[in-house]
Amino acid sequence: MFSKHPFSTHISGRETPDFGEVFDLDQQVWIFRNQALVTVPRSHRVTPVSVTILPCKYPESLEQDKGIAIYLGIQNPDKCLFCKEVNGHPTLLLKEEKILDLYHHPEPMKPFLFYHTRTGGTSTFESVAFPGHYIASSKTGNPIFLTSKKGEYYNINFNLDIKS
């Protein structure tokens, strides 16, 4: 079942994203390379991207019981993950966008939202815009992507280590 919401939205009276790192079950972390997020083995010589996370301000307008709807971004450079159909396939992309602008938008920005589900110590991130498609990783050095092949060939389970 779903855990309680692991993210804070108010620190010192103002909305503030949480920050952390993501790594898959093969101990591969996310890094920013060539305008994409790719996975590489975790080591002391690798600096993972800092992910930024904010829950959707209006979750009541989205499907219930699918997890916590979140915006997922990175720092340095400030970009957000979003899903778009490219050549007939749901595709995971990065876009220069401020996570707080998405949060304050008067309605949910579905292409930028993911249902976060935590089971035990691992998390999955399902696209709100493309239900049944999850953020996934595969081989070292390859970009993260969307897949509908849940648990078949690709890793859709991640460890989310919140630092704030």
Curated annotation (Swiss-Prot):
Prosequence residues removed at maturation: 1-12
GO biological process, one term: innate immune response
Entry-linked SMART domains: IL1 (SM00125)
Residue ranges the record marks as coiled coil: none
Family matches, as Pfam families: IL1 (PF00340)
Keyword Cytoplasm assigned: yes
GO MF annotations, alphabetized: cytokine activity
This protein's UniProt keywords: Cytokine, Cytoplasm, Immunity, Inflammatory response, Innate immunity, Secreted
Protein origin, superkingdom: Eukaryota
Subunit structure: Interacts with cargo receptor TMED10; the interaction mediates the translocation from the cytoplasm into the ERGIC (endoplasmic reticulum-Golgi intermediate compartment) and thereby secretion.
Function statement: Functions as an agonist of NF-kappa B activation through the orphan IL-1-receptor-related protein 2/IL1RL2. Part of the IL-36 signaling system that is thought to be present in epithelial barriers and to take part in local inflammatory response; similar to the IL-1 system with which it shares the coreceptor IL1RAP. Seems to be involved in skin inflammatory response by acting on keratinocytes, dendritic cells and indirectly on T-cells to drive tissue infiltration, cell maturation and cell proliferation.
Annotated family: Belongs to the IL-1 family.
Official protein name in the record: Interleukin-36 gamma
Taxonomic lineage: Eukaryota, Metazoa, Chordata, Craniata, Vertebrata
